[in-house]
Structure formats: C-alpha cells, structure tokens
C-alpha cells in the first residue's frame, strides 16, 4: 500500500545530505535502513506501473532495483563504500536512485564551490526560488516556467539592467508537485546564485511577473556558509521530491518530463560533471584492506547475508 503523508517509510530528501561525507561502520545500519525505506517506495511505483501496458519493462527494472547491495568496509580507516548494487538508474521514479543521484550532484557542485570561493572569496551563495501559477496541465506549466527562466537569464545577459546582473554563476533545478491548496500542478525552480550582494527580491518579483504574466512569487535568501551543504541540497533534492508523491503522480511526471533537462548551470558553475555511476567513488582507498558486506532485500528490509575479507 502507498505510504500516507508523513509516514516514516517515506524517505526524506534530507537523507541524501549524509551521503556525501565519510561514513564509518557505525553509520552503516542507519544507511541500510534509509535505502530499505527508499526500496519500499520503488516497489510501490513499480507495482503501479505494472498495471500500465507500455511500462511493464520499466516496472520490472524499478522493481528489481536495490535487490542487493555490496559494501566494502575499509577497516583501517573506518570508511564504508557502496561498491556494488543492482540499480535501475531511473532516478525520477526510484527513490533509491534519486538519493544516490542527488548526492552525486550535490558533492560535485560543492567541490566546484570550494574552488570558486578560493578564487573569488567575495562571492556568496544565495538560494533563489521562482514559481509559476498552478495549473492542471503539467507539460504546459513546466514549459511556461522553463521559458520564463530562459527569458530571465537572457535579460541578464543583455546587460540592460536586471536583478540578476551581479550573479557570476548559478545552478538550478526544476521541481514539480501538487499545490497544497489547489491540488493542481505546481512547478517551481530552485537556484543557487553566486553574487557579492544579495539580489533584490522586490525587483526580481516585478521582473518575474513582467515575464510570466501570471506569477510574482519569488524568494531570495542567503545560504549559511557554515552549512553550505544544507542550502545547496534544496537544488539537488529535485529527483527525491519527484518520487515523494503518490505513484500515479510520480509516473505522470516521469512520462511528461523524462526527456527534459531538469538540472542546469551557467557562469562559473558551468561544466561541472556529475558522475554517471551511482556507486561510491573509491577515493584512493583501493589499496587498503577491506571487508565485503553483502545485503539482500528480503521481507521488506535489507538483511546481511554474508561477508568476506580481502
């Protein structure tokens, strides 16, 4: 059965934040539990798709995702890496792949941010949110948002005076969900904008309304540089939020937006490469001794089925 709102079986988008740091053996049970909850969500989506004739092969892929997980514990430095797994790579459908994909992107852009701030210490990160009016047609609303965002960015490039003139680089993602009041599709955009001074929210709202014709709700706030990951995560949890919906909405969003570019960047954030593999990077640990831990998903949770030294 689908998990009701607030059910702890649903994986929180915040869970991907812990994916980017070094994790020791004591954290492994919690990590495996997170993946188990995400696997349950994937099974719900797969079950829904199994009843749709054109999606049965995709349903099988998602259903089998995360059937097993292989970890390596490098015990001399107490680090645990996800070394192997059966993954469907459908991160807009599968909560497990969404967590891994989001964490990979978060780590890649945080590493670029560290390089940027070392070269340009006056730049500060700001979280910018842009919304458009809710509507019943997801494709139409998404295209409206996408077109408006492109026009906003073009106005900055034309150097004719824009609230984003001081932005040296940005990375943004598109997120969709049902509006809490309307029940209609509510696409919106989260952006990390790098600038020396905070973009003016009032001016941005006026320009956004001029572009969209129906929307003026924007938000601009500084990101706490003592916890940059928390602010950046708002952008990179977009895939997790896709799967944090009823399966019917998740699948509809996937079919509607599956071919769209939902993560983009510009300026000094351009060119960041997010690894395709959803497994952990070895990070130079390959030559160290390790213990292999093999987990299988059985009866609604992961169970340790064996281990071996190497």
Language-model region placement:
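Right-hand nucleic-acid polymerase module
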Residues: 1-185, 195-310
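Cys/His-coordinated zinc-finger cores
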Residues: 191
């Amino acid at each position: 059965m689908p998990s009701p709102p607030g059910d702890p079986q649903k994986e929180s988008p915040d869970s991907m934040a812990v994916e980017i740091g070094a994790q020791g053996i004591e954290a492994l049970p919690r990590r495996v539990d997170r993946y188990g909850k995400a696997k349950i969500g994937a099974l719900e989506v797969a079950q829904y798709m199994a009843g749709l004739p054109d999606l049965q092969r995709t349903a099988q892929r998602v259903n089998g995702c995360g059937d097993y997980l292989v970890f390596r514990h490098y015990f001399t430095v107490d680090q645990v890496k996800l070394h192997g797994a059966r993954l469907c790579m459908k991160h807009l459908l599968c909560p497990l792949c969404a967590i891994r994909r989001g964490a990979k992107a978060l780590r890649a852009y945080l590493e670029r941010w560290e390089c940027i701030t070392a070269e340009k210490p006056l730049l500060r990160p700001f979280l910018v949110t842009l919304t458009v009016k809710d509507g019943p047609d997801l494709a139409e609303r998404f295209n409206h948002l996408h077109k408006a965002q492109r026009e906003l960015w073009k106005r900055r490039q034309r150097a004719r005076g824009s609230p984003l003139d001081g932005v040296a680089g940005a990375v943004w993602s598109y997120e969709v969900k049902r509006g809490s009041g309307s029940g209609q599709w509510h696409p919106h955009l989260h952006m990390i904008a790098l600038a020396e001074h905070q973009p003016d929210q009032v001016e941005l709202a006026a320009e956004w309304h001029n572009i969209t014709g129906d929307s003026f709700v924007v938000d601009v706030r500084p990101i706490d540089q003592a916890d940059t990951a928390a602010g950046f995560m708002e952008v990179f949890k977009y895939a997790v939020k896709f799967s944090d919906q009823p399966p019917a909405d998740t699948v509809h969003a996937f079919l509607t937006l599956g071919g769209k570019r939902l993560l983009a960047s510009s300026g000094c954030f351009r060119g960041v490469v997010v690894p395709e593999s959803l497994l952990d990077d070895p990070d130079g640990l390959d030559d160290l001794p390790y213990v292999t831990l093999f987990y299988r998903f059985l009866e609604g949770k992961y169970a340790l089925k064996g281990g071996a030294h190497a």
